[in-house]
Amino acid sequence: MDESILYVPAGPEGSALAASLHSTRQNAAFRYADSKFLSAVCSGQKAGDRLFLAGSKPLITVYSWGKESPDQRIPVPEPLTCMALCKHPSNEKINHKVPTFQLPWLLAGGSASGKLYIWELSSGNLVCVKEAHYQAINVLKFSECGTYLVSGGADARCSVWKTLDLVTIDDPETQKTASALTFMDHTLAVTDIWLTTGIRSDIRLYSSSKDGTVRNYDITSGKLITTFVLPLSVECLAVDPAGRACYAGLSDGTIRTVLQYKVNPHTSVLEAVGGNGKVVTLATDPELRESFVHHQPHRVTSVKVSLDGTTIISSDESGRVMVADAVTTQVVKALSPATSPVIYLAVDTVVAGSQFGRFEKKHRLIPQLKRVLVDGDLTKHFVSMEFSEEIKPQPDFDLWLQQKAEEAREVEEEKPKQKEQDSETEKLAKLTKAYGDLRQKHEQLLREMSA
């Protein structure tokens, strides 16, 4: 397995690039990638995936993975400031091959007016328009399971929406409902949002703001867990896959490590930092043990963490993309710099040695995105889907082990029974032999007495 880094610069003259994290290979390139900060999103980094970019005009530019020039330019109601994709809900009962033409389920976009737009990509229908914030929406994120959509705006609010309530087109009253949760603890604009992966009842929300704080919330209970106070404005953040640390990119070019667990010096026990709404002020780090300074003095625009949590990938407003070791904080790799600030950074796991840049010629264009809300009549709801052949069920390894264990148990249980049966057979043979000898003796005595 390998990891691929996709970074998109700002401005119409830039080119988005995808490069390998563990080698010098360049996987893909996209020319004329006009986009603004956080107004880009990618469905993946393999054949059939797409890159969506939104610039200063009310247009969405769509690229097919592996093709340098754009495939489509789709008009939208107004310029979008951020976007997010929601995958199709998983269903373990469906077991089909991945089709050539595949699209995510939903595309969400936020605007400078505070409106939230949601399109269904398979049909192009506009399924939701909502006045979500009082000011511009800065960031949108779907949870991994697709249950929640979280929006952060310049009005210092974080709103948690239930996806099902937003896309229920046959019940207008459901779409009028307010957000499930609204967090108003920040005092300045929200700059980034991070949602942890895992079970639905244990999703944590991390939000950063220009007020210099990173706040950790529990979505299930709606409670503030911990507030981390940093010395400068927090521009972006990323969380370790195991939840061990949070990495906050600051406005002066520093990336600060915010540990979520520390060893108690009195008890020598590893304990969680904060909790129960505590405010934790991070101490200065003069020895730079928990700080990455390779981007100074340029503002950090994005931070990502590798799959194993040992590598930090970051970008800044000068166009540099750096790879650093999470333990030593030393730079281990520098990618080809962009000519303008990097506004989008994504890291995906891919198959090593595969055709990363291969363009799927049999692809189809996605439907045009509507600018008017869809009719609530479900009989008029048409979607474009490709059905692939069903995969033959493979033997379940766990079931095979269980069957072998049962067979071994049956063999072990048959051994005592076989021993008992052999013992009874031997005893019967002895009795038969003794009876035969006794009969011969009786016949001999009878002949002697008769004579």
Swiss-Prot record:
Annotated Pfam families: WD40
Region listing for Disordered, in residue ranges: 408-428
GO terms, biological process: DNA-templated DNA replication; rRNA processing
SUPFAM superfamilies: WD40 repeat-like
Residue spans of the WD repeats: 89-129, 132-171, 185-227, 229-271
Record keywords: Nucleus, Repeat, Ribosome biogenesis, rRNA processing, WD repeat
InterPro entries xrefs: WD40/YVTN_repeat-like_dom_sf, WD40_repeat_dom_sf, WD40_rpt, WDR18/Ipi3/RID3
Intracellular or extracellular location(s): Nucleus
Cellular component terms (Gene Ontology): nuclear pre-replicative complex; rixosome complex
SMART domains the record matches: WD40 (SM00320)
Record carries keyword Repeat: yes
Superkingdom, taxonomy of origin: Eukaryota
PANTHER family in the record: WD REPEAT-CONTAINING PROTEIN 18, WD-REPEAT PROTEIN 18
Membership in a protein family: Belongs to the WD repeat IPI3/WDR18 family.
Subunit structure: Component of the RIX1 complex, composed of IPI1, RIX1/IPI2 and IPI3 in a 1:2:2 stoichiometry. The complex interacts (via RIX1) with MDN1 (via its hexameric AAA ATPase ring) and the pre-60S ribosome particles.
Function: Component of the RIX1 complex required for processing of ITS2 sequences from 35S pre-rRNA.
Protein name (record): Pre-rRNA-processing protein IPI3
UniProt source species: Meyerozyma guilliermondii (strain ATCC 6260 / CBS 566 / DSM 6381 / JCM 1539 / NBRC 10279 / NRRL Y-324)
Underlying gene: IPI3
